[in-house]
Amino acid sequence: MGLFIKKPLADLMTEANDSGSKSLKRILGPWSLIALGVGVIIGAGLFSITGAVAAGYTGPAITLSFAIAALGCCFAGLCYAEFASMIPVAGSAYTYSYATMGELVAWIIGWDLVLEYCLAATTVSISWSRYLVVFLEGFGVHLPQALTACPWDGGIVNIPAFVIVVLMSILLIRGTEGSSIFNGIIVFLKVSVVLVFVVLGWKYIRMENYTPYIPTNTGTLGEFGFSGILRGAAIVFFAFLGFDAVSTAAQETKNPKRDMPIGILMSLVVCTILYMLFAHVMTGVVHYSAFAGQNGIAPVAIAIDHMGQMDASGVIRPDYPWMNRAIVIAILLGYCSVIMVTLLGQSRVFLSMSRDGLLPPLFSHIHEKFRTPARSNFLFMLLVGTLAAFVPASVAGEMCSIGTLFAFTLVCAGVLIVRKTMPDAPRSFKTPLVPFVPIAGIITCLVMMLFLPADTWIRLVLWMLIGLDIYVCYGIKHSKLEHMQKHRSGQTTLDMIGITLSVLCVITGLWHQQTVGWGESKVLLIISFVFAFTHLAFYLYRLGKQFTSLTR
């Protein structure tokens, strides 16, 4: 079968039903899964992008943007729910692809997920450090920049970012039950802050702030009007990402076939309702134009400052000034759960890949006492912690988004395939309106990917090249599906993929430089060229070697 050999569904179900001392402990129920999803979806995005999008693109109609973005995510969520009920294994999109599209595609998406979770945890850890600094400054405590920023941001080492990664990793190493309880408490607190904002702010809504609900387009595509709503949807779409991490906890769920679809879909529903209520109150309390030019959570502070009564001089005295600090606390708590869930997802994907032989056995070792992949968690603690301590957030930023969207695309495509190839396979949940829903999910994700900048594509291609190297040198030789074969078919295909990625590396490098200007820094262009030509030489050499052996 070569590169596209598929993992039999029977093998996956055997793996899913494993309950020995070296298996993951099943302790999660539907409420825990919903909390897991809400925990990873709601970060600072709700507080930081709502005002900016309303001011620049949508006006009060940002609620419609949230609804459209949620619908787009729902397409992928329904596909994930079907797979999670059909193949309740920890590997998420990696495992689903292995069963439907074969080993090579599974490796690509698994390697992509590792990038997604690693960079998400890194980026959020750095942001957590920044908000901690802001929070402590409110009490007169000033941490030195040398110890709260990386060398590229004017510091030496980001100690708070490293510490939060270590703390969340220790929680995960000691067991899913404890980390689940901790996550549940955090989710309760941050959802409470959002609801308090909505409830207290509702009585200060002024209907004139909703007029016009959809501001007239400025004449530029995407600035207000219907096109502005769509552009706003493309931006807030990324505030919903993360629900896919729920599917990585399948083997720690008591009844995964029933509970996984509930956890995935209900977490999306809960977050959509909270997002729309928050945006409705925020744009109702103060006119959306007041948010223009404000960064971070400043627009939320403006809304809170307008929650009060106007005195004789026409100045509004805020009734709830303490809410600004509560929002920062909610962000700090929210980031803790995001870091924890992304670290969990990362180790579970590596666990599945290692069990299939594509990665060393180290990553599939289960601690007999804690029943967790402790060694894998420890390794990622060091990796993510080091990145968070020494790498600027701007480097990691949008990479996690493109990784997630790529995974969504393949999962939606997988549903189309599995309906044809395994129509009778038992599944407790079926994606409705097939093929419309999967196709709509694919189109939505591809469109969102096109909105991402060129440097994001460069880093994705570079990461794929590194992943291909590991698969060529290790994975293809140790795969358990064809472990008896010394030489597997498909080597020429791998070489052609390597050559294609090398060419794409050059193209994306030139595209990025053209976008930012030829007078700007050429670091990414140089890196892409070095990667491209070294890999081009390597895979051309391999291809020539195979051709020579065939002609003898």
Q: What is the predicted role of each segment?
A:
Residues 47, 112-130, 235, 240, ...:
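Membrane-helix boundary/coupling elements in multi-pass transport proteins
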